[in-house]
Amino acid sequence: MDELKPDVLQVHDLGMSMTYMVSKWARKRNIRCVLIQGTYNTTLKPGLKQLECLFNRTFGKAVIKNVNAIGAKTKAAAAYVQKYYNKDVSITPVGLDESKFVGCSTQSDFRKRYGLENQVILLYVGVMEQRRNPLFLLDLMKAMPDHFSLVLVGEGPLFAQVKDKVKKDSIHNVVILGKRKQEELPAIYAASDLFLLASSYEIFGMVIMESMYFGTPVISTSTAGADTLIDESNGKVIDGLDVNAWKKSILQIAEDQKLLSEMKKRCQYYIANNLIWDKASDNFEKLYFA
């Protein structure tokens, strides 16, 4: 790195050995160094939990001493740092790169193509894996009225199990699209009424931002990204995976067209005015050049 002669260095996460080494290198050379924290929960794995806490209180102490400023992707990540050290932490959520959607149309015959013209569309986009709880979404759909349909976009370790459960349990109101190209997503987001994210852990959750950007309110479990991006005016955060609680929240929003319309507008406004990169980068610049 000596050859690069950086003006500012950004390191990630308190508990990383690379973070310690780079921040130490920067301090020796009087180079401004900024820590950005994403992790917000201590690991639950036996043994590793104690090791993580020990690292954070030893090498982590050196990291805090070495860096000039601290940012966190979410409020939960900020609290994680402050659990160990009484330091100022700025909230620096990542931004949405609009350029990847340039030329992508939000207009399509998506509803007609899949026979969903008169349906309330609930959408999930992401990896079919354990921490995202796609099987819970299927249990939820068994409790929803017939005019609600769930569209699943993505593949992953649980993909086959999801397909098997839909068939075995005769869940007729689910459309499984599998993996889709990036340019197809805007039309799918725009055609949907609500986005569902039942994750047990999300450092941020880019799909939340993408969905809100295209005007689709998100109902999510309480994870770091959801708690930072969503409030009662633009979506809903629910503690836990209780089918009745999720059903109640979905019905309250989806069956009130005025409320749903207002939420859609607030979603788009919030992302466009705060979290596209042109806006979000302001928070990082304040840390870099303070």
Where are these regions (language model features)?
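Nucleotide-sugar donor phosphate/pyrophosphate-binding loop at the beta->alpha transition
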Residues: R32, N41-A62
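Carbohydrate-associated surface elements
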Residues: A76, G95
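Conserved donor-binding/catalytic core segment of Leloir-type glycosyltransferases
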Residues: L116-M141
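Nucleotide-activated donor-binding/catalytic signature segment of Leloir-type glycosyltransferases, i.e.
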Residues: K163-R180
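Short alpha-helical donor nucleotide-sugar binding micro-motif in glycosyltransferases
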Residues: K179-R180, A187-S192
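Aromatic "clamp/platform" in nucleotide-sugar-dependent glycosyltransferases that forms part
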Residues: S200
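Short hydrophobic beta-strand element within catalytic cores of glycosyltransferases
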Residues: P217-S220
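Conserved acidic donor-binding segment of nucleotide-sugar-dependent glycosyltransferases
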Residues: D231-E232, K236-V243, Q252-K258
